[in-house]
C-alpha cells in the first residue's frame, strides 16, 4: 500500500485538499487523453449534457483509473477502506473557449 505520509494527511486535514499526488505515469496520462479524444469523436453531443457523467461505466480506461491502487491507497489513508466511487465526470475546457472555472465544491457529500 502506498499510503500518504502523516504530513500529507495533516495538509489534507488543514486545507481540505491535497496536491500534487503522482497517480498516472506519462503513458497512462497519454492513454487517458487518447480515450477522451475518442469519446469526443464518438459522442460529441453527449459531453455537453448528462453523457459526461459516469464515464467509467462506458470506458475501460476510466474504469481502470477508478480502481488505481495509487488513488485508492491515498484515499484510504484519509477515510479508511470503505471507498465508493460516486461517479466520474469529464469536465472539458478546450483551449479555444473563453471563460474560467472559479474555485468550487464539485458536489455535496454522500452519506
Per-region residue spans from a language model:
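Non-heme Fe(II)-dependent double-stranded beta-helix
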Residues: 1-111
Amino acid at each position: 500500500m502506498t499510503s500518504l505520509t502523516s504530513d500529507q494527511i495533516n495538509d489534507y486535514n488543514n486545507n481540505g485538499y491535497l496536491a500534487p499526488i503522482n497517480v498516472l505515469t506519462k503513458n497512462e496520462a497519454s492513454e487517458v487523453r487518447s480515450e477522451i479524444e475518442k469519446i469526443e469523436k464518438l459522442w460529441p453531443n453527449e459531453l455537453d449534457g448528462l453523457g459526461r457523467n459516469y464515464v467509467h461505466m462506458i470506458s475501460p480506461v476510466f474504469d481502470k483509473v477508478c480502481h488505481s491502487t495509487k488513488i485508492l491507497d491515498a484515499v484510504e489513508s484519509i477515510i479508511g477502506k470503505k471507498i465508493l466511487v460516486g461517479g466520474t465526470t469529464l469536465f472539458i475546457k478546450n483551449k479555444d473557449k473563453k471563460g474560467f472555472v472559479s474555485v468550487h465544491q464539485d458536489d455535496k457529500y454522500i452519506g
